[in-house]
Amino acid sequence: KQDCLDLPPKRRQMLPVTLSEAEGQGFQHRLQLKVEDYRRRAAAGLVRRDAEALAVLTALRQIGAEYKLPAAADLVAQLQAEGQAVVVFTAFVAAAQLLQQRLGGALLTGRLAAAERQSVVDRFQAGEEQLLISTYGVGGLGFTLHRARHVVLLERPWTPGDAEQAEDRCHRIGMQGTLECHWLQLGVADQLVDGLIADKAERIALLLSRGQAQLDRQPLPRMVQQLLDQW
C-alpha cells in the first residue's frame, strides 16, 4: 500500500510495559483466577471449550488493558508535551473512558450516537483536540485521522488486519512525516495475539512472492485452549 499510494513511512515499535512488583503480583493473580475458573468449568463439562477459551482470552486482554493504562497515559502525555497530535485505539470502552478521564481529549466509541461521530473526528482533524481515543469497532474503519503523527494501540484485536486498518486511519494521503505506531505489550495474551498478527503478515508476504513454504497454523480457539491448559 505504501509504495502504491506514495505514502510517507510508517514505523511500528513494540513497547513492553513494566509493572511494579505489587502491580505485577496483582496482574498475575487476576489472570490466574480467570484461568482457574475456566479450567474448573471446562473439566466439569459446563462450557464449550473452544467458545469459552475465546471468552477467557478477551477477559485476559481486558485485564491487561487496565494494567497498561498508566503507561499509555504517560506516553500520550509525553507526546502531547512535545506538541504532537495522538490517536489511541483500544478494544474496550471502559479502558477508553478511563484514559479520557485521565487525559481529556475526544472520545469515539459505540456509545456515541452515529450522527455525532464525524463531528468528533472533524474537531480532531481541525486541531481543536490534540488527542482522540477510540475503540477499534468505531474509529478503526471509515474515518480519516491523518493529522496524527502518533497512534497508540493499547492492545490489538485478534482478527487479522484490524490492527493495520486502525493504523491506516492515520496513514493517509496528505499526512506529513512518518507515522509512529506504538504497540503496548503486557503478558501472554498480547504475545499470543501479536504472534498471530506477525504470522498473518508472513503468510501474505509468502503469497505475494509466490513462496512455496508451508506454514502450519492452528485455529485460534485451539491455540488459546493449549495456552490455558498449559498455564
What are these model-predicted stretches?
Residues 20-23, 94-95, 113, 138-140, ...:
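Conserved nucleotide-binding/hydrolysis micro-motifs of P-loop NTPases
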